[in-house]
């Protein structure tokens, strides 16, 4: 069905709304999926579900063949949805934990069966049972669900367990108070590139966290990317910058690709160049340690092409717009924390 003059709206395999530029639409029956349409028209699919499921099955097999790095810990992932699932898969891929060390939970029995088969770990709908047998409990539910989850698993909590929450804007003190004991609570804010081991995560500790527990949390999140430890007062800023940040960068990549199309490049070529350029620039910053301004100046020759492009960016307000985006997202995180 066409609901926009320039896009076809459909639903992808995850149930998300997807908009497909008309040049990539298949010219056959309306019942074709978004992915099928792209394949039939010669466009490269963004995601292949079958290959991803096969990959996870292979990871599960590999995890049983290589000794786990932390074999002494039992782990519960309560709410193995988007981010919880990303972390769980990273644990297996990096052999941080063996499948038999992990018990994940989801909201529906049918999904539990499917994910147990896919991941090779114990998956159920029983949060209390998972928490009871775990040393390390990851809280992967949405912020508004945290109080009910803590109440549900409270009979299984002891001061020897460690809780790691990545529910946005939920403070460590709130979880400590809900637990009703001096339990270690660590707050984490990862982002979606963690799925490829290229994430960025901010961590902060509650009042009862030992140095050893914090080191464990850092080790866990370093399996999915870079990790920084901050004071809790800065966690909303982490949310506004790195947790929301991938969306900002996707817009930049999309805009660069559109620009490439505008000046004559095929769309797939333009997208690859835009994405790789963004990746390469980020890698230069991280691996050289140079300030971005110095790296920018190294590309900008007198009276050259780049300085003209930069002039357009500055006149268009890109720098200020990005700053305002992070400020607004940070403010929204604070609003959510305040209820």
Feature roles, as predicted:
Residues 59, 174-184, 200-238, 250-287, ...:
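Internal alpha-helical scaffold of NAD(P)-dependent oxidoreductase catalytic cores
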